[in-house]
């Protein structure tokens, strides 16, 4: 840390930047660390520290979560696989068509989300002879000429149960998994109007699952983005590299309706220039929302 102090002082002075070198502080200084612990203790005494789980941007190359503002500093246009997967309903011979741009999250699927007021149609795919539910507005994206068997609202699908595509966490049914839920964030702008829910890898997914009081939760990916042994077929594989194998699995099990490639803007780690993933992180958090109004009021007093 101290090796290039003189060179640093010389360079900063030459470029005309003002820095108070003689009264600086470093985060490695013991007195500075003590001050941080003091602040933490004050927050603890006020009941503003809690232990919880939050879905956060994760740098798998560094093995550490990033702050949200860090995650927005390095977006890149990339190509990713997108798949439409068929989930069979428990009590009928129909399937739910679900679209996702993160195939690697499918082994962790615990629910499917619809929009209460969205119209869904039941159609019969002539190629597979399967009856499939998808949003009425999205049918033309998948089929040129198709017969509509039935039209319902999303609310009619809520609480219907379906069979998991992957077997790894089938026991989670006892905790309320593999059921259709609803939420206002579901749209028909893209995909099928049915959204795959993997609460360990999506902020909305976790929020919706919790709102229904479902306790099921699985996270078979470590901090370096590799599948754990729970997902036996892909154990040890980096999640992005596993996409191809997962798609092959879906094809082999007749669960794949469509495979495509999309181009979109995706967050990268600003330090390592590698793709970020979003993952549930158990940690200690500050209840900022409890005093957010005080922060805003204080800001308004600043000239």
PLM regions: where:
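Residue patterns forming the tRNA-binding/recognition surfaces of aminoacyl-tRNA synthetases
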Residues: 1-107, 159, 185, 189-303
